[in-house]
Design a protein with these regions (language model features):
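Hydrophobic, lipid-facing positions within transmembrane beta-strands of outer-membrane proteins
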Residues: 24, 47-51, 87-91, 136-142, ...
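Cleavable N-terminal export/targeting peptides
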Residues: 1-25, 235
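Transmembrane beta-barrel strands of outer-membrane/channel proteins
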Residues: 24-32, 65-69, 109-115, 142-144, ...
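Flexible, solvent-exposed loop segments that connect beta-strands
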Residues: 34-43, 69-86, 114-135, 161-180, ...
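Repeated loop/turn-to-beta-strand initiation elements of outer-membrane beta-barrel proteins
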Residues: 22-24, 59-65, 100-107, 150-154, ...
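Outer-membrane beta-barrel transmembrane domain signature
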Residues: 97, 120-199, 205-213, 233-235
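Short glycine/proline- and aromatic-enriched beta-strand/turn motifs that initiate or cap beta-hairpins
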Residues: 17-77, 149, 232
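Outer-membrane beta-barrel "beta-signal"
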Residues: 93, 192, 222-235
Length: 235
């Protein structure tokens, strides 16, 4: 919740800047978590909610800040369902190279910062354990939007360099860090403008990430597919 408070406070001064555009959006979503952890398949069903604020300055600079919460369960090979929760804070800073008036599309390369924290509670070896994960990443991406009347269509493609990817199981004295430094994400949004201020948006997001233990033999790969629906307001 501290991330959400930070997001809301940061949006207040942006709405008062003249000759610029601000939008705030609330999204609800579902996520299917796939992939594998060693020889074991990953099978997760998560719900999510997200709040995102984006500001376009008159000098073509773009700043976006979002907070997302996910909760649900992963099903283990023995049929047990875990209790999974995560929080993600994502900052994007970009520069609009081309706008719809000049090019027919908006093109914005960006970088930023991502902080991800997760907790997965389960029973293993006859004990209740908690697997805690902490990840920090720096994304490098490009966002493209095209427009047709009230409809707009986009694509957001990014690679993120992980400065930290650590998983801990305190009760078992397990502390693992990944030597795999990159993750991949692509998202496809479709937006419909209801009126001058209000819009609806649907989005598909696919992410891929790998965890390779620096000192052991453990290897895991996540392949997540997420669908979100949201409503937004422009200022």
């Amino acid at each position: 919740m501290k991330y959400l408070l930070l997001l809301l406070l940061s949006l207040i001064p942006l709405t008062s800047i003249s000759e610029s555009k601000t939008e705030v959006m609330l999204n609800l979503g579902i996520l299917n978590g796939g992939g594998s952890d060693g020889d074991f398949p990953l099978d997760g069903d998560l719900d999510s909610w997200e709040i995102v604020g984006k500001h376009h300055f008159s000098n073509h600079l773009m700043v976006e800040l979002g907070y997302q919460s996910r909760n649900g369960e992963y099903t283990l090979t023995d049929g047990q369902d875990t209790d999974y929760d995560s929080d993600e804070l994502k900052l994007k800073i970009g520069y609009q190279l081309c706008d719809a008036e000049d090019c027919g599309v908006e093109i914005t390369p960006y970088t930023g910062y991502i902080r991800f924290d997760a907790e997965n509670d389960l029973n293993a070896f006859g004990a209740d354990i908690s697997v805690d994960q902490e990840v920090t990443k720096v994304p490098l991406g490009i966002e493209v939007w095209g427009y047709s009347g009230a409809w707009s269509y986009g694509a957001d493609l990014s690679m993120a360099h992980k400065s930290k990817d650590e998983q801990k199981i305190d009760v078992l004295a397990v502390d693992q860090e990944s030597e795999s430094n990159w993750s991949f994400e692509i998202s496809i949004p479709v937006r419909y403008q209801i009126n001058e201020r209000i819009f609806f948006e649907g989005r598909f997001i696919h992410t891929r990430d790998e965890f390779e233990d620096e000192v052991g033999n453990r290897e895991a790969e996540e392949k997540n597919n997420q669908f979100t629906l949201g409503v937004g307001v422009k200022f």
